Amino acid sequence: MSAKDAGVQLELDGRPLPRGPRVYLRRPLLRDRTEFLARNAASRRLFRGLAPPLTDPRVFTAYVRRVHKGLTVGLLVCRVEDEAIVGCANLSQIVRGPFQSAYMGYQVFEPFANQRYMSEALPLVLKVVFRILALHRVEANIQPGNLPSIALVKRAGFRLEGYSPRYLKIGGRWRDHERWAMTAEMYRDVSRSR
């Protein structure tokens, strides 16, 4: 990896992206396409009914371009030991001004599910939200049957704010979602208690 690539990948707004003992965050590059698409394709069963897997090279290219234009914050979750892409997180619809908020989505790929990689990665993503981007609020919308994801945000300190019937169309069906959120004040309280 060139020094230029390393800087683009491991920084956001000129600040280093956070690392944990087992995972670190980095921004995607076009050269990640083969691994990223293969991980998505291998995760079809895991994602069934939750999100369509991203397997189209053109869609991945457009995603990376949006990330590098600053239209969305895309983060790959990579394993420290071998740099494998184990998952990803995205911050979208970032609104500044008096709202200072974003929506967050995330996923872990097969065969890395149920190994607590996202339990380590989510607090790193929250550091990006509240320390690097200096947002006041982040929201995650989760289908009620996605118990592992609900457990993940609960452990991270999110609170349930509401229920949105027929919120998002996935797999040709409108799906209900629970609205989970965290504010900067909640993040400070959670960070102090750990």
Stretches found by the model and what they are:
Residues 45-64:
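Conserved GNAT-fold acetyl-CoA-binding loop/helix
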Residues 65-76:
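A short helix-loop-beta-strand connector motif used in the catalytic cores of GNAT acetyltransferases and
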Residues 55-58, 68, 107-108:
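Juxtamembrane/interface motifs at transmembrane-helix termini
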Residues 63-66, 128:
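A generic secondary-structure signal
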Residues 1-35, 39-44, 74, 78-194:
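Acyl-donor (CoA/ACP) binding surface of acyl/acetyltransferases
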